[in-house]
From Swiss-Prot:
Keywords: Autocatalytic cleavage, DNA damage, DNA repair, DNA replication, DNA-binding, Hydrolase, Repressor, SOS response, Transcription, Transcription regulation
GO biological process, one term: SOS response
Protein name in UniProt: LexA repressor
Species name: Ruminiclostridium cellulolyticum (strain ATCC 35319 / DSM 5812 / JCM 6584 / H10) (Clostridium cellulolyticum)
Lineage of producing organism: Bacteria, Bacillati, Bacillota, Clostridia, Eubacteriales
Annotated region of DNA binding: 29-49
Gene name of the encoded protein: lexA
Record InterPro entries: LexA, LexA-like, LexA/Signal_pep-like_sf, LexA_DNA-bd_dom, LexA_repressor, Peptidase_S24_LexA, Peptidase_S24_S26A/B/C, WH-like_DNA-bd_sf
Length: 215
């Protein structure tokens, strides 16, 4: 059983380092589950804790959401060679993925968060941020496609031309923001779609600062 546990730890560590090496950020717990064949995220958390205890991964105790991958080879078993390792010293942060948005409720309320998306701290720009998965093709001309993840910096105001996530009723929408004479225009970046004109104040949840796509 100990050997089996060690093999699984190695498999997880190799997968994490492979993702960091290829993508610049580690996989989510759900992605690790799928990659190594686990059904429960709690099992993955248990194995990750073992890797932390062994010094392969490290969490920053002052930043509950941050994880730092140590600058060393992915070597759990003694018979692994250095050439099989991947290297990184970038500090990571788990950005919450928001599944739904409800008027009058904080965007990062626990019940709204469906997953986390690990990113280098410098991507987040030292600000509160969240991820939202895009549904539809209203922003394709801006390079934001259906099922992409947008990285959103929380803020309640915007400048003309900013791509924002705004709340209209109970629906979050991603559009380009324009404040005009007596209304706000939320412009889709798709020539086949009409803008949304809002005459009352709307709630801006944040500005889009990044786009991520799973191939």
């Amino acid at each position: 059983m100990a050997k089996k546990n060690s093999n699984k730890q190695q498999e997880i560590l190799d997968y994490v380092y492979k993702c960091v090496h290829e993508n610049g950020y580690p996989p989510s717990v759900r992605e690790i589950c799928s990659a190594v064949g686990f059904k429960s995220t709690s099992t993955v958390h248990s194995y990750l804790q073992k890797l932390i205890d062994k010094g392969h991964l490290q969490k920053d105790p002052t930043k509950p959401r941050a994880i730092k991958i140590l600058n060393k080879t992915s070597q759990v078993q003694e018979n692994r060679t250095n050439k099989e390792g991947y290297y990184t010293s970038r500090e990571m942060v788990d950005v919450p993925v928001v599944g739904r948005v409800t008027a009058g409720q904080p965007i990062l309320a626990v019940e709204n968060i469906t997953d986390t998306f690990p990113l280098p701290v410098d991507f987040v720009q030292n600000s509160d941020a969240f991820m939202l998965r895009i549904q539809g093709e209203s922003m394709i001309d801006a390079g934001i496609l259906d099922k992409d993840f947008v990285l959103v910096r929380q803020q309640s105001s915007a400048n003309n031309g900013d791509i924002v996530v705004a709340l209209i009723g109970d629906e979050a929408t991603c559009k380009t923001f324009y404040r005009e004479k007596d209304h706000i225009r939320l412009q889709p970046q798709n020539s086949s779609m009409e803008p949304i004109v809002v005459k009352d104040e709307l709630s801006i949840l944040g500005k889009v600062i990044g786009v991520f796509r799973r191939m």
